[in-house]
Amino acid sequence: MDVGTKSYISHQEQKMTATVEQIESWIVDVPTIRPHKLSMTTMGCQSLVIVRLTRSDGICGIGEATTIGGLSYGVESPEAILSAITHYLTPLLKGQPADNLNALTARMNGAIKGNTFAKSAIETALLDAQGKALGLPVSALLGGALQTALPVLWTLASGYTAKDIAEGEKLLAEGRHRAFKLKIGARELATDLRHTRAIVEALGDRASIRVDVNQAWDAATGAKGCRELAAMGVDLIEQPVSAHDNAALVRLSQQIETAILADEAVATAYDGYQLAQQGFTGAYALKIAKAGGPNSVLALARVAQAAGIGLYGGTMLEGTVGTVASLHAWSTLPLQWGTEMFGPLLLKDDIVSVPLTFADGQVALPQTPGLGVELDEDKLHFYTRQP
């Protein structure tokens, strides 16, 4: 064996034996640009759990886990996510080979039930570090990007019709967005329908209008509400009924002309399989946090594709780190309904050194190794929650 070959093999062995050396995590509280009103809460601040994973070869990867309104959306709060990472996932992964993502995912899932938000932050950091080690963007590690700029909508959720219309007009004039989602379900059905109709009439000839009910309606209200939303020209209706009422969701998808988007009803590939098996015909909102990470979420996407169900890139209103991690996954898929990865735009500040670029109704996917973004250490320190 010549010297060159020995050197190459030694280099490869060093790369292959890099291990997880350290995992740090913080809760970072960033104010929003305005109150963001959903059916279950109103947000004035977003709490991001930021992770930095350091390998034995010195390469660092970053990740993020973010939920909505503390415990308003799901079973993991920022505090619980931080605790799971600190006390359970970190001891489990320290010293393990850092470049075998499937083995590490199996290790996490085998030892720790649920906690997909925390696992997603770790999976993201592992992918970021691996991409940097190989000189490849995360999208390449996930099979390769089909597109380097992805459509992104904006949510009109001030809670006031006139304000939402004015905000939509401004964004259309700027050319930043071509689709809007309305948050409804917190008020009486008639009030929500009047609010939606006014916005459709004001903006619907220039933009796609969708609504998100966030599970607020029972089956009867859902049937009535969805029929009226379809009649007024709404393009997509997201999770109108409880995540536990698959039967009603399936009926709506089969009976309403407007597409129904399942969000809270689908987190894992098995959820997607069950809903498809029951006859659901709409679309699935993919979210890396619900599935366990940018790689793990692709299993749900494959189930949807096999069943002929559309795909939509969903958000937990993440900051830039979580948003770009999602974008790398979404870029590998045909997204019939685009994405809603506007999270960073909802925040008053950004904790990365170079923000993402939003223009012409799209967001650009970074092409540099790893996620393609780096933390601004000063801002990270400034917004980190103190004990």
Give the label of every model feature segment.
Residues S7-I9, S242, Q336:
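Intrinsically disordered, low-complexity segments enriched in proline/serine/threonine
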Residues S158, I184-E188, Q215-W217, V241-A243, ...:
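Active-site-proximal loop/turn and secondary-structure-junction residues that shape catalytic pockets
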Residues R227, G233, H244-L261, V266-Q362, ...:
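Shared catalytic-loop signature of beta/alpha-barrel
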Residues K6-I209, N214-A216, A220-A223, R227-A231, ...:
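N-terminal capping/lid subdomain adjacent to the active-site entrance of alpha/beta enzymes
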